[in-house]
Amino acid sequence: MEVTRCGIHGFHETIGLDTDELRFFWALQSSNSKAQQVAYRITVSSDKGTLNERPDAWDSGRVQSDAQRNIICKPKSGFKSTTTYYWQVTVWDQDENSSQSTVNEFYTSYPRSSRLLPPYSMNQTYMPHTSLIFRTWFENEADRWKAVWIGNGGDKPIYLRKSVQPRSTKRVEKVVVFASGLGHFNLSVNGKPASPHVLDPGWTNYHRTVQFVGYDVTSQWSDKDNVIGAHVGNGFYAGDQGDRFFWPMYEDNTYVRYGNELCFFAEVHVHYDDGSHETIISDPSWKVRKSATTLANIYASEDHDRREYPVGWDAPGFDDSTWKPAKPLTGPRGKLRYQSQPPVILHNTFTPVRQKQLRPGVTMFDLGQNSSIMPRIEVNGPAGSEIIIRYSETVDDDGAVFMPDPLFKEFEYGVYTKFILAGTSDKDIWMPDFSFTSARYIQIEGASLDRNDDLPTIHSVTARHVSSAARQLGYVKTDKQDVNDLINACYWSFSSNIFSYHTDCPQIEKFGWLEVTSLLAPATQYVRDMEAVYSKILDDIIDTQESNGLVPTMAPEIRYMCGPLHDTITWGCAIAFLPELIKQYYGSTEVFGKIYQPCIRYMEYMKTRERQGGLIEHGLGDWGRDIAFGNHQANIETAVYYQCLRNVALMAKELGHLDDEAKFTAWAERIYAVYNKHLLITDKTSRPYAFYTSLDNPGTHDCTMVAQAMALQFGLVPAEYRADVIKAFLSACEASGNRIEAGEIGLKYLWNTLADPDVNRPDIVLEMARQEEHPSYMRFLRRGETTLLEFWQDACRSKCHDMLGTIYEWFYEAVLGVKPVGDAYSTWALRPPFASEFGLVEGEVDSPYGLIKVRFERTAGGDVRLDVRVPTSTTCTLVLPAGVRVVSGLPAEVQTSSIGEDVALPQGTYQLVLLL
């Protein structure tokens, strides 16, 4: 049995951990289908040599348990700051055979209560200059930050550098840099990037929290001179519109900068082989100058004058005598917190699939795929030549960049980059440092592919997909090309919206709207490992929550909204939905402690918004039903309220707050009763079955698919009426001609209901998806789209929205047939798509315990071949409908002669034949 994939819940990287409570996890692999973990031991030590025998930090001892996730480590004395810790897992199987993991490590920073402070205090005569009144007088110097925020006092991008001469002849063992630059920064050491990250640090409410990043630069550190360089741009911290499009200022000018001075800090921790340690900090000894990037508008307008670029500025030997000393700055108000979520990195490279000269000096390049990108342009020409680079998801009939929504024409002409050539080398290369967009098309003006023109020459145009570094998890493929194309469009829509937060679109808005976070979580967890992203989003929600308990519709809240665009439970519910989803998908309760009280405050706030004894109906309803504002407020919002209360009760139980569990359980039961009192129609005078109505048209008893789906999926239907409500749901589908009659909220529960084992109508799902006219996914694809649009319309402002992507969940759970049952897929169900039109389906889900693989194929003889890989430490329940039985491929111990009986498949690989 091999111990693999060791990690720490809530942390993607581990170079700067700032908490004394960690939760470990690991996975196992074994070719023995009977192998089971029966015990484990975890050791943690600052001395690698004592890890097994005398760990100096923590030793779990041998624990009789099969648990592999959510293992709490909380040393009595905490962890020392700026220290490398090693940890290892030993497991024993049922035969007392032991296996050890490789040695893992993490590096600590400072306690989360610490923050950088203003460099000078009014009271510095009486107190240390790094103090803030009394607090840091009593703070252990080893446990607090020593660096100060620095910059040049301006709000335009800057370069900062620090030359470090050797201070010791001792051998360097490890070099770690903690740094942050607001809004975003790139760090380099000796002329090379410190990491593959882009857009560090993650976006937060900088008044509350500022993320710092940890970099291990040991391999780049020299025993001679060293140079640390930082390039800092605006981001959302000090957003710079320039003369371009900037969404927070587009309609109502409610954006307020967090700060007006771009700022940076760094601590470089150099550890020597004799155990000594020195710290190099950001202070006025650093040098600063303006950047060659003259505008860093995060909405993809990033100007760059290559003539101003100081070649070699971040490497040893550069003459910085004309640079100015950095100024100490006050910096942001927020506390420093380690960037725990996955960084943003560059993924796929796109090269143009076609190009077209629109007119002399203007060329359009088609990348073939819409996605979130950072473009890369290689051009050469005379110094001072200006190149304009535009981006678009759409082109007009002539092939020029185009915004089809007339209300957003400013986006068409107001988003561009001006690149001024240096003309001193064979090629001038530009790629953005501080911005990104979503685009399929890149239009270049002022240059030509024809080297005989009197214009600068375009040598290369490419683009890199930019997204979170979170682990990619799987795929689904069928024998239907239109379905595969839709799966692909969903994937690119999701991947293009995952950064340090989950946004709804990477070009027009870039905001952290919370409904996509919670609504799409069951689908997104098939795209990427989202645990650390969701944990960070919950931190954003805590920072954004208002004093009365309200959770706004976005976090961070970069732009103040009002009315239902500010207060809607289908957005705010992320505070109560995400913790339970993290437990369900990743087997961790790490977030419960920090989010529990904020959840209670939100429920108390929502109680003040109840009407008619418990209904909630003040929000956006089924947003996106008719382009924007929706309906079914009482049905949707009250159902979500009910589920929030149930989730808080579950958290209370997990945390041992039994009185609270009883309180919220009773509260939820009250809402259940009120919901059915006002919305369930049982008299059968208008229809021969019970059904749910909306309150959209008082006095009428409408019967819609969304009203039935919400009640069914949230467990609000009394058992005696469940069959009736399913009948009402299918009747509503039939009455619509199997057309989608749902906005983005109802859409998810529409698909979930059609996948419900008691309904199981994949034919209706595909008929809805394939409609000729909107609402229709396939209409998007027939018109050449490669991602999902914002609304059910052709001329849409945003063509890389993921909010309509809830059907992606259906592809995994109802087509591939894989669905988690126990936490983290410890047990999972497999429901092969017997009732569907698919002849072949295959796919993978890289679950927390290991890789799940499924291949379903109908044969010419009429039976089905089903290949299944069940990871170690998990059990699959193969769900068979009536009339289906396994005729070969089962080991003797799980043989069954019954027809239509669920089969428990223990870990292992199976090649089954099923007879229909």
PLM feature spans:
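Active-site acid/base region of carbohydrate-active enzymes
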Residues: 183-184, 283-290, 449-489, 495-496, ...
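Active/binding-pocket-proximal capping segment
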Residues: 185, 193-196, 200-201, 541, ...
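Non-catalytic C-terminal accessory modules of carbohydrate-active enzymes
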Residues: 256-267, 277-313, 339-341, 348, ...
